[in-house]
Amino acid sequence: MAKKIDTVTVEVVRNLLMSIAEETYGIIVRSAYSTNMKERRDVCTAVIDPDGNSVAQVESLAALLGSMLSVVPNIYEKFGRENVHPGDMFIANDPYHGGGNHLPDIVIAAPAFVGDKLVGWIANIAHHSDIGGKVPGSTSGDADSLFQEGIRIPVIRIRERDQLIPSVLDLLLDNTRVPQEREGDLTAQMSAHLIGVQRIQEAYRRYGDDLEACMKELVAYSERRVRAVVATLPDGEYSYTDYVDGCGDKYPDPLPIRVKITVAGDSLTFDFTGTAQQIKAPINVPYPCTKAAVFFSVKALMGDDIPANEGINRAVNIIAPKGCIVNPTEPSPIGAQIDCCQRIPDAIFGALAPIFPDTAVTAGNGACTTTILAGEGAIGTDSVFIFHEVIAGGGGASRIFDGLSGVQVNMTNTSNMPIEATEMEFTKILARKYELKTDTGGEGEMRGGLGIERELEVLQDDVLYTGLGDRHKFHPWGLQGGGEGGVGAFYRVSAQDGSVTRMGHKTTSLPLKKGDVIRVITPGAGGYGDPKKRPAAKVLQDVVEGKVSLQAARDQYGVVITNEDGIHYAIDEQATSDLR
């Protein structure tokens, strides 16, 4: 019979485990080499119990949760629990064999022993700017096989009994275009584990076997909390279909992401039957990422105070037919899977909005708008530079608040890449514009968040540009009469003649010349409620702040605003009353 632990001790241990995850996260961010990790913070860390269940994870990227939830069970399956030793570290990146979400996401896990007793694990995952493959940045819009996307790392040891295995590190570094940066980032990940293991050992020495008992109770508590919320919902089936734009010229037609959610008592089932089949293009979503998307959606709707751990997964059932785009078969390409993965929460939120009126949000930018620029001339000894940025967009609105502008949504939660960091690290790139894009937030009583317009000029010839995005065709939807958010777009401005060319949403390795400018516009977000009910004073403030144009204020909100001197704005009360 499991030992009963008092709730105060469980809560203290929960916060202790969270502090361990947060401390190791901070170590990686502070010591990593690449801007991907130290600026964008494309990193996630977790504490895992001896049985392989996640019990505490830092609140960073929801997209990275799926990989860490499966890494320890995969280690046990391949090596056997009895063959895991103190001082070991395991590494992987292959989503089909216990690794990351796509090949650039490298997960490392380390066991914590006290004497001969395995008392827990520490795991982290981080996005590396290049791990080989057909294009710089290891992420393209046209790969038709996983083998084109970089080196595949099954679950293997990189350290054994406190000793680095040099041959494994050499193999990884020889398969990247930027080996110095890769070595620095991998060292940061491994160094964080040295502290993480130490902290778990200290926790065990303090709490003894009660530590594992608290871990089990935390998982059980999260499951109970989710089931308790589900039990209050009306039984029934709730369905929604959203769409991915397609994938380049090869797949121009929309791809449906269809979910049917069944509520029965305290049971919740997500059925993706009817979703598009897998394709020979890199937007297939590995099943661990689909699982993470459901995990995120459940937690977002049911309470941010529910501890994020394996208990949430235990409270739900997922049906994702093998061979569909959200559960592809090996070796389907998955490099740009995040654009499709983003649509899973959108579909779930759309389905459950009628029974979650207080927490439902409209569709946000729903993309992972990626810009990769690669050329000669990196800082340090590496022969090339690879600039990788994910640009934010609009956040969804709800019944009680406007959407946030210029933020990552759903599965992504990376930080802004400051202009100063960009130009300091990448001296051949000049930022020409970085601002919110007027009128991209959907109109509503609560306005959707705005997308961003970003312009980057290249200062040398022979730079390759890859641009990956979505919602360039399908607008982010609104709720309860709210309007759609703006779509995204990629443009090239030629240095030679100033001509502007719109590019596809999956542009791969486009050659640029010195002085060419890449213009990226990210999607906005849908609005919530009748825009004519938005207080005129709020519309005025939106106009003053450049979020809504004078024309949109009149046409969409029914608010007439004057600007006779070009400086001061005022509401024309009579004209507004007539329109409304």
State each model region's role:
Residues 1-86, 91-580:
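Glycine/proline-enriched, intrinsically flexible loops and inter-domain linkers
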